[in-house]
Design a protein with these regions (language model features):
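Glycine-rich acyl-CoA binding loop
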Residues: 37, 48-59, 63, 67
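Active-site acidic-Proline motif in GNAT/NAT acetyltransferases
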Residues: 43-49, 77-78
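Conserved beta-strand-loop-alpha-helix junction that forms the acyl-donor binding cleft
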Residues: 73-83, 94, 98-104
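Conserved active-site tyrosine of GNAT-family acetyltransferases
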Residues: 86, 91
């Protein structure tokens, strides 16, 4: 349901290899002069090949060209790989939305064997 809302409200972009979509993200206008990258994903078979970083650079360039001054992204507290990627791409940790996933998702989420309960919010100035 949340993903459908993102798609309806945002701009959707895909990453392609040999004509096949292997990654995607949605760019949302969330507040004045602020956009957020949501629902970013890369197929597991092609992860760690620079596709996620390329999509994040594309998101930053697209947001900047559209007049946004800030770009935000969020990930779960157990998403250490995602946080490292986002940091390498210029995002900085801003705040933690404690209990976000526990509140908004009926089933517990585990990532790398750890409970994903909090949303780590990150941002970059464009």
């Amino acid at each position: 349901e949340a993903v459908a809302d993102y798609v309806d409200r945002g701009w959707c972009y895909g990453a392609f290899l040999a004509g096949r979509m292997v990654g995607e993200y949605v760019l949302l206008h969330t507040r004045p002069f602020t956009a957020e990258v949501v629902n970013i994903a890369v197929e597991p078979a092609v992860q760690r090949q620079g596709i996620g970083g390329a999509m994040l650079r594309h998101a930053a360039e697209t947001a900047r060209a559209s007049g946004f001054r800030k770009l935000e992204i969020g990930t779960g507290n157990s998403g250490f790989g995602q946080m490292a990627l986002y940091t390498r791409c210029g995002f900085r940790m801003e705040w933690i939305d404690r209990g976000f996933f526990s509140l908004h998702y009926p089933e517990p989420i585990l990532e790398a064997g750890l409970p994903c309960t909090d949303m780590v919010r990150m941002g970059m100035l464009l």
